[in-house]
Curated annotation (Swiss-Prot):
Keywords: Amino-acid transport, Cell inner membrane, Cell membrane, Membrane, Transmembrane, Transmembrane helix, Transport
Recorded GO MF terms: L-lysine efflux transmembrane transporter activity
UniProt source species: Haemophilus influenzae (strain ATCC 51907 / DSM 11121 / KW20 / Rd)
Protein name, as recorded: Putative lysine exporter
Cysteine pairs bridged by disulfides in the record: none
Keyword Iron-sulfur: no
Domain of life: Bacteria
Function: Mediates export of lysine.
Gene Ontology cellular component list: plasma membrane
Compartments in which it is found: Cell inner membrane
Signal peptide range: none
């Protein structure tokens, strides 16, 4: 836990101190992410885990379905308590941590205020999950994976793998596949209703 926190703090400080002379080419983070996922795939194969075990992992797919259902139920409950339209609560809960998608879709549909809410909501999930994964992984593996939402397939995957070992990686990838396929559909559907 201390290592992760230290890495984040050092990264923020270095980014702030070096912002004037250290510039990364646009899109370079995409190539880093693709390389990272490529090496995860090599590591899975070297440990005897097949592509079928990764993509069609029953536990990961079931977790994705339960996560989606519980997120939508949470959106309805939040809408009730915050006195907002149910479709708006459902839309806010449909981002699953994919802040770059949810903020754009909801800004285009309902304006910058709702887009900002979606951005903060989903970015908060990702930031919190970076710190919560190591805490939950020992005793609550499913919870540790599910708190990541859509980021289980990309930026939080290395932390899931480091905290839980190679055996949880197929579960996280299957879960991440579900939580990356559904947000575009759900966000567009729920945001099509006027508020």
């Amino acid at each position: 836990m201390e290592e992760l926190l230290s890495a984040v703090i050092i990264g923020i400080v270095l980014g702030w101190l070096c912002k004037d002379w250290l510039h990364f080419p646009n899109g370079s983070n995409l190539y880093v992410l693709i390389t990272l996922i490529f090496f995860v795939g090599i590591q899975l194969r070297n440990n005897g885990i097949s592509l079928k075990e990764v993509l069609l992992n029953k536990q990961g797919l079931m977790m994705g379905a339960i996560f989606t259902l519980s997120s939508l139920i949470g959106g309805v409950i939040s809408a009730f308590f915050l006195s907002m339209p149910i479709t708006q609560g459902l839309a806010f809960s449909s981002g699953f941590g994919w802040y770059s998608l949810s903020s754009v879709v909801l800004t285009n549909a309902w304006g910058p205020m709702q887009g900002s809410i979606a951005f903060f909501n989903d970015l908060s999930r990702e930031i919190l999950s970076l710190f919560l994964i190591p805490l939950f992984m020992q005793h609550y593996r499913s919870t540790a994976i599910e708190i990541t939402g859509a980021t289980a397939l990309d930026c939080t995957l290395p932390i899931i793998q480091k905290s839980g070992g190679i055996e949880v990686t197929p579960i996280a990838i299957s879960f991440g596949m579900v939580t990356n396929l559904l947000p575009p559909l759900l966000l567009v559907f729920f945001s099509s209703f006027p508020i």
